[in-house]
């Protein structure tokens, strides 16, 4: 799938589903589930690298894990889920030339067909515009932006009028720049609904209500494997408890055998 194909999903009122992945096994599970998008998110910092936030993740980490994810795909590159890679902290806030270089490394050295970038500050918009002109598709990300948690925290965004209106303006700006879709994270449902109505490109929600054109979830959260479960993601199984008990049973049985 190509990024440009997602617009057809919105026109046809076809829900877009995205899952995160971080290695070959999770990539295989995400792709075989039928997800339209497999996102190698910088959330892998917490999911598999043991960090407390996304900030320590490097460009090399993202390239390494994106390649691992793609090796789990069963279909040909032209047919499999759209593979998107997060640009980690300080790889696109460091000037246009460096951002193009780093995004280019992701696209050239992995099977990712797009990058995701958080925020819409003027400097970030300049970078997004440049990347798109250079032929690199960009997925936007507004609302709660984890890379900005030192300034904004991890709380719900858009609750005050000023923030509410800014997120709406930023969404329109990102569409105008050429983003093929926008992730809306942890914002009021009404705000997400208004943005979805205003935009021609699809919105993909996570903790943003039911009116987005699609939904994305961190796979580890869905499977109940995360240490801290976000309030907007109900696990489909208590994976940590289930697999923990099964492993204990096996260890016990092996010791007694």
Curated annotation (Swiss-Prot):
This is 3-methyl-2-oxobutanoate hydroxymethyltransferase. InterPro entries: Pantoate_hydroxy_MeTrfase (IPR003700), Pyrv/PenolPyrv_kinase-like_dom (IPR015813), Pyrv_kinase-like_dom_sf (IPR040442). Homodecamer; pentamer of dimers. It is found in: Cytoplasm. Pathway: Cofactor biosynthesis; (R)-pantothenate biosynthesis; (R)-pantoate from 3-methyl-2-oxobutanoate: step 1/2. The gene is panB. Transmembrane segments: none annotated. Binds 1 Mg(2+) ion per subunit.
